[in-house]
């Protein structure tokens, strides 16, 4: 299992477009991929699950991966967060 922490850097937070990018990236991996906010863990391969986190700018998110390509999956998801989803950063 790999656990990484990141912070929402884009001003708009996690809305439909970033949720889709996260899910599309997570689906590429065989590992289970989860996002966790304040103890609420969701499946990162589910756009609706990601949206329900209601993660706004500055929110801390934990990325959790389990499986054969867990390190690559965690790093790919973290890279999306670090890029601010190519949106306006705060």
Q: Model-predicted segments: where are they?
A:
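Compact, glycine-rich, soluble single-domain proteins
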Residues: 7-57, 80
